[in-house]
Amino acid sequence: TAVTTGSGLVTLAVPSSLNSAMEAKTTEVMTVPLSDRNGRISAGAIDEILKRVDKADTVLIGPGLGRCDDVSEVVESVLEYSKVPVIIDADGINAVAENMKALSSCTCPVIFTPHTVEMSRLTGLEREYIEDNRLVTAKEFAEENGVTLILKGHHTIVTGQDGEQYINITGNSGLATGGSGDVLAGTVASLVSRGINETVASAMAVYIHGLAGDIAKDKYGIESVTASKVMECIP
């Protein structure tokens, strides 16, 4: 998605055991094989990852990582080291939720992209409370932690660390499909890498993602919307 939305160069860090398959599948991006354990990136890859972070304009971490101690160590190391914006999605969110202190040593701009369940893990709040108090919950989390927050759901809410909020009007229930969040995360990373303010870039990405979902719904029918079709329909 980052390539589709304008990134000139995208590098995908993958477990070495999966590198050949990913090279064959992703023709538009470069892959970097990393030391792994049981098919997941291991803590032994941290030095190589940080070298790559030095060369990046933006880092997206989380999609497909899985949940284990090594992954948590990788995520925490990237947060502590990075000087460029870091987008934390999927299993990256789970890793931070297990150790919120990881944010205290972080000096780079951070963007979280949780859905309600992930937001519950981050905050310790009940899902029902979050769903009934989305604006307040998002604002408090963003301000208290000094981050940008994309709280996904019906009318996704984007909140900046200063409390500024945007409510998105695009999108439909067809976007609640596997991989759709990864499409959004890649779009956020692409726009942030251009130097656009993190909150504005996040709001733009959410709007584009929702609009692509609406185009896909009109083209294929809501029951047939998939992540790949959403990416295909990005205007």
What are these regions (language model features)?
Residues 1-87, 94-111, 116-235:
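Small-residue (G/A/S/T)-rich helix-start motifs and N-terminal tracts that mark the onset
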